[in-house]
Curated annotation (Swiss-Prot):
The gene is SAT10. Keywords: ANK repeat, Repeat. It holds the Pfam family Ank_2. InterPro entries: Ankyrin_rpt, Ankyrin_rpt-contain_sf, Multifunctional_ANK_Repeat, NPHP3-like_N. It comes from Stachybotrys chartarum (strain CBS 109288 / IBT 7711). This is Ankyrin repeat domain-containing protein SAT10. The lineage of its organism: Eukaryota, Fungi, Dikarya, Ascomycota, Pezizomycotina. ANK repeats lie at residues 840-872, 878-908, 920-949, 959-989, 993-1023, 1073-1102, 1106-1135, 1144-1174, 1178-1205, 1206-1235, 1239-1268, 1272-1301, 1304-1333, 1339-1368, 1400-1429, 1514-1543, 1548-1577, 1615-1644, 1651-1680, 1696-1724. The keyword Transport does not apply. It comes from the Eukaryota. PROSITE patterns: ANK_REP_REGION, ANK_REPEAT. Pathway: Mycotoxin biosynthesis. Ankyrin repeat domain-containing protein; part of the satratoxin SC1 cluster involved in the biosynthesis of satratoxins, trichothecene mycotoxins that are associated with human food poisonings. Satratoxins are suggested to be made by products of multiple gene clusters (SC1, SC2 and SC3) that encode 21 proteins in all, including polyketide synthases, acetyltransferases, and other enzymes expected to modify the trichothecene skeleton. SC1 encodes 10 proteins, SAT1 to SAT10.
Amino acid sequence: MSIQFFSYDVGGLIVKEVRLLILWRRSALPNGRTLFARMTQALRIASSDKKYRSIFDRTSLLAFFATPHRSTQHQSPESVALALLNQCYCGLISPWISIFPPNFSKVVARSEVEFRPPTRAHILNVFQDPGPASPIKDSVVVHKSCAVLGVDGEVLIGLDCSHYTLARLLKARDKRYLLRQASHAALRHGKAFQQVVGLFFLDSIRTFDAEGPKFECRKVVSQLASLPQLQSWRQGSVDSRVLWFGTPAMLDPTSLFRTLRSQIQEENQLGDPIFIRVDSTLHRHNELSEPQILASMCQQILRQQPQLTSALQDLLLNVEDAAVGSRDCWKQRTLWNCLLVLLYHPKDAETFCFIDATSSLQTKNLAGQLESVMKESEMPLRLIVSCRSTAKQTPEASTQVDVDLSDAGFDEPLRQDLEEWIRESLECGLTDSTLREALLTQILSSGDFHLARHALEFFASTGSWLTKWSVPSVWAMLSKQSAAELFIEDNIRRHGQWLLIPMLWALEAFEPMQVDEIDVALMLEDNGVAGQVEDFINLLPGISTIRRGVFVIADHVRPAFDYLWGKYFATYQHHVYLAKSCVAALRHHLRVTPAIPQLREDKSSDAAARLCTYAAMNWVRHFSLQRNSETTKYVPHPTIITANETDPGSPNEHAGVSEAFLEDPELSRLWITHLRRALDLDGLDEELGHLILPETLGSRLGICTGWAIRISRQLASMRLSSERDVTNSLLVIGSETDDLAMVQSCLSADPSPTEHTLGYALAAASDPIKEKLLQQVGEPSDEFLYRALLSSICFGNVSVTEDLLVRITDKVRVAQVTPLEGSKLQWPQANESSESAETFRHTPLGVATAYGDADVIDLLINHDISWWDLEERSPPPGTWNALHHAALGGQRNIMCKLLLQQRKGVLNSSARIPNTVTESGNTPLILAASRGFHKIVALLLEDGSMRGYGVDVNIQNEQRSSALLAAARYGFSQTLEMLLTYEGIDYSKTDSNGASILHLALVNDREAAALQILAHKDIFSNEMEYQEANMEANSVNNFEDDDSFSESSVDTTDVVYTVPARPRISLHQKDGSGLTSLTIAIWRNLKSIVEILIAMDADANGPEGEFEAPLVAAAEVGSFELFTMFTKIGATKTEAALNTISTGRTRPLHAACAMGHLEVVRELLKDSVTQLSHTDSNQRTPLCAAISRDQNHVISVLLDRETETGLQEGLWEAARSGKAHILDQLLRRGAEINAQDEYGNTALQWASYYNKPRCVERLLLGGARLDLLDCDNVNALGDAARSGSAEPLKLLVDVGVDVNAEAGGDTALCRAIWAEEVECVSVLLQGGAKFILSSAQSRFENLLTFAVQVSSPEILRLLLKAPEERDLAPTLRSACAMQSTSQLEVLLEFYDPAKVDLGSGWTILHLAAVHGTLAGLTKVLDHATGRAALNYGPKKVGTPFEMAAFSSKESLSKVEHLYSNAALPGLVQPSSRFGTALNAASYRLNDPVVVYLLQKMQLEDINASGARYGNAIQNMLASAWMDTERSLKLLGILLEAGVSLTPTSADRHGTALHTAALFSPKPLVEKVIETSRMLADERDGEGRLPIHLSALQEEWASMMLLSTTTSTIRSVDKMGRNAVHLAAAAGARSVLEKIFEVEENEDLLLEADFDGWTPFHWACRGEDDDCARFLIEKARKIFDSKWDSMKHELVTTDEKTWTPLDVARFHQRREVELLLSLGMTTSDAENWMPDQSQNLGSYCDSCACQIWHEEHHSSALHCKKLYLRFNGWSRMCQLAPTAKRKYTPTLLGYKTCFKVADNLVKARLAKVLVPHSQGPLQRKGRGKGEGEEDEEGIATVENYPVSQSCGVEMIRAFVIDDRRIQPDATRNLNHEVSVGSEDQTQMSLGTGRLFVQSVDSPLEMVMDVAAIFLSSPKSAHKQDETTRAFATAK
């Protein structure tokens, strides 16, 4: 085991790497002491050594993996814990330490003195945490019980895996996997740490596994690190350096380099941390090509600086071609461009690259080129090149350091140590191949998998392994064994895994470095094989696997396959098992590689389809770098097949690449399909897919198998939509590969390819193909030539470029115009395609400059063509020109050439060109300065001086960064010096964060740059000078907003600048964070700079309101030297200074206490002890700050001086922080355990909320009260429940707290459910918590509904499992309406329809159909009970299909899904609301669903009607007011489909015109009338005409449309009502005004209906006072003198009739004017108060909806405008003969239900029944059966007539006149009323009423409700129900 500690620019990491060394020494793990000693060394160096203080300060994460172990074979937990305490952490106590050793206290004390832990860092602790059902059985355990450290900031991550798997987390070859897992885990647990740029692990040399040689290796490296050359390389902090070292053949350079890196880091004399990332794929036994090295360097840079991926967006045209094209020179060219962009892009940290150059002279020269490239910039880059060289052989390049371990002049002691090291490592006797063969034979025969793996790992480190060991030799070795077949079969059955690994290794199926990935893929465990034997048998053919993008089967593997297939799977195809063989291994690759795109789910069950899916994704992984939503391709194509089959790596060398694709076209099709999916491309049709098959291409083009496969792969990765696209692509491929035959074939197939294709092919063509293509073009256009020219420059095809230049020049000269004027060559506009915009984005000169082609630039300049001058074409603002490209790429020579040509006048550019800006606001000067190109900066500054104009050095880009600010930020000393001394520079410029050049240098740790800036003391000023200079500069020239330098300007006059007095920098200036330069320097602990700033009169005390006072910063940093420095210079420890609170941070004493700086604390407390009571901005005392960071040594000092108040504050902080040992100290010193802070929180509440079980336990034992509440009325139990503190909650429950008590309106269970804390809910349920919904959550129906809405499925399942009675009905309704289906799935597990009543015949399928989503509906249908209700529906509800059509959520999808599951779309239920699904969809105006249903339904079903509105058209018209336009469209659809305007239910609902008149706007009415004019004369079931309903809707325009000879305003319905009655009832004053404008209509004013109600009655019944007022005023005018007598009739109240006044009073009409008009005096009106209803509830006589509250108005919006039965349902038998109604009286909100069969109803009448016949109300005889009592005192009501107009509401009316009390009614109050049989009960239908009076005063008695039902009419249709009368009273 080993511990590595490494640091980098943003943090540090401690990682434990576990490795089982069982090759030759199968012993236990190394002693734990070694582990802890090494970790101690790293931590002590980081915490105490001044050299490494920056590393310690920046450490943000400590990661422990598998620490410590607990096993019967290893150390006990106690000893491990003691060692950990002694060697690593001080004062650490964990509950698993059961027995403390005798010397425990001494160890702790010694640890506290010797070591201070890095308390700032977060701790990530990974351990084993198997579940109760986990199959893991492991002897070595890393469990929570022994791995938890118990320190602050610790994040615990439990994994259900074996120790073997856990330990191997750090051995994964793809280190990004571990990085991703660590970062994700930390983020999931709420711990954010700084960005980790990479991971590196120190490991032993792979060649030698013994422990000794590893330390000898470190000895060698230690001597190597002490070499002067290496010291020089390490000390260069700014310049880019190259380190060369040669290694013997037996020494793995990668391993040596790893050890070297570690040694350099540990001995780093600089303050800057070093980080180096080595790609595991770099170690190869074959020679790397130049493109491979370039690609590897790009990968290494991007892994260290992942943010640089955005820099690749600006690459030019052929970036993608490098991955798809064929010519290596173009690949290399593009990769160079990518590498230069990454090298030169501004970076805030150093970058390291490693090259294993082996013995290739070519790669050594490449490294030399890189060194020269690096010298052009000041950007820091470290390049390490490893060369396996022979004696006297050095790299052929000029390098700064040459170190060759094999050189004769090499340091002799170092040589001796190295040779001894190698000799000792070979003493095992494996120096010769014979011994290796013998050992391998022995290992394979033994069946020991672990031994075989490590032996093969050892052998694979030598270069001769892959050639010496092959499949034939291994297979022959196995076949030599006796009974070979039996032997193999037996080993397959018993040890299926061990045989596969050697064969895979020997065949190079996987690289040797990937052995652990194979282990994981095969799911191997320590003690056995996981999986079925058949799985491993299927994996044996995995010897042939994915190899560089092509699936191949090597011929020398065929014998093995033939044997295995013949033995086990003779009846199956080969490729099927090849697919199975790769699935497991590839799955691991896909899991750990984030760059692989996610494929759509493949529904194919064929194994070959799975193979192609994984293979395609594996191929994409090789060349794609995922960047957000884009993919930048820069790695060369991985295919190893070349045109020349005799080349190395060709098919012939591999004994014939598999012809599986040609033999099986189906496999080829699958491969192409999944490859296109992996690239996110559209699929191909069958014909197009056939064209790109390898066999088709081979026969069409006459090419070999290898090329056919490769071209097929290229075509499969392109966007193809037609056969022409295939031909054009083949033309380009033929041009790229210089295949004239392919080009001719393509031109023959398509003689007229697109200009884009021809231009691309021409740019890539050689001379013969170029001539052929130019002949094909004929007379090319300027645009074609321009596109081809740009492409040829990108490809570096000089020959084509020169030819095109000649052609363009001739064309221009002949035309005598510039292409800008005479052709279509223009810059792309906004409406042009992105492809065109990208093509024309750069000029030819700019493209050539970007690629650094000096020859092409000369060619462009020397041609007499003016239109590529930098200004001639006047590109739009923000366009890059050649100077930008030269500055961006560090092309100094090209920059010189361009500037020189400008001076000569060859390039007719103006003086403003060097000041033009890109889209980001960058000038060439800013680009060069931000990349450290100091020579280019000097050129630009010098050129401006020579030409007589000034380069604007003060321009700032979008980020407000100028050239000077960029140089200061990145510490480019030479660039910075030039700019600081340049005339006209503005030193006071700041960036977007308000940082000056000095701020940037200090913030980015550029100490040298800061010193360089401070050396120019003349640029600094005091505050007054600073303000004056700024004012002067702003008044002279302010160029920031000046647009005179816009590139689009046509003014070419040179600009002469007026140089103002330059503003200087103030030392008091603050950046955007409020920090001064002095404060930043203190934070960085830069003492020398602090001294300089103080000497320059920087304010040591800081100005008033300073964000971070220097004294506070010094106290927090803990530098006693800095602190005393401030004391000496005058920053005295005055009370004001010490009490300074830096905004948002802390005081000096608080900062020192929190950081544990004891010396500073004592210094601060010398003179002012009162500081202990001061609080910071977080209201914490210094003691609290020390407790929060567990600074025990500071706490001891503070406790001796604390007051009682301070001790109390400390107690709360200790409880919050979980410091139990400090809690004990504070309680012993007198802190009150039950004290409450200002928010009412006690220590117990703090500990409970923050999950500190040890503190809770101590407080409970100390007698803490459980009933105390905080300011939110929450107790400790509620705090623990809502914060997820399960352990403290368990402690509280165990001590007996009431778990069902409410606190603050919530119970603990409700809080835990709301917080989604499963453990807490479980604890509470086990503790006896009941299913009680708290008062604060009363808006939910029950606890389960509350859990469904606010909590997780796990908690819901936990509640459902509890043995509590529960009602699932409301819970199911709530779950069905949710978007997520997780809660619904849980409920379905417990759903039993027999036990759950959803009401009114509803089923769960109905709920899901109307309220749920498609996913929820699918879940319900999949349930056992869901499908049972598919075509079932209650009468009033309808079927699920009907509900889905009515739904507003995914209605069409749900309808389609139900139909696919056998739902009947034509099912008709006339009694339901809509009747059919079509009607429901029409009402919802859901035209897609309507169209779908019309296609599925029969013609006879589409006209079916429902109970509410009628057929589909009527339902649509009923809701047309919501969307008129959509309704008109839907009406046309329904009419076209044959839906009738006169439905079968017209006798009940009327025609469609009735519905339109009542609900729809005028356009719909017009549309219906146009369709059928005759409908205006049709009547509905109540005799109403459409004009009646329009009057009710107050639509006068519609009434005019509906007027006919038989349909007028005088027409009456069956109740004798005309349009005036209905308009008055609806309050339609505008209609009444129109009607009474005609004098002939005045008689309608007093027209009475059959009940005797005039428009006055109906106006008083309505709600519009204006309408009643209008009628009264109109009556006064019409009747004039007769009005007084008429008015008396209107207000006279008697027992016979209801006057308008009665109606107004009953309906609470309070308008004084109306009442006065009805005959009341002024005094009576002022004192009159309406009768109150005593909160009586009942049913509305209009809509049967419940009525509540004092005023008798229905709560339903459609009460008036739907059924129009304003005065009661008492006439229902006559109005709607087919309808059946039941009325349920209510009393004070509680229903009293009566069954039909009941003949006796208990009631107490308050008034006799008053019978009458036609005419005035009269009383009949008073005999028995006529309303009197019988012998038993029971009154009968059989023969009493009931008024048609009184209705139910009149029965429940209150006494209006107390004087009309019948004296004989009192004796009937306590008697029952009997209801006669059907034959006996006959009620006349004349006008009359049933009236209720009071015995006493109406204000003293609460009246009861009486309701009466009418008998059926005298017709042939008799009702089934008898007429009943009900009456109730108290």
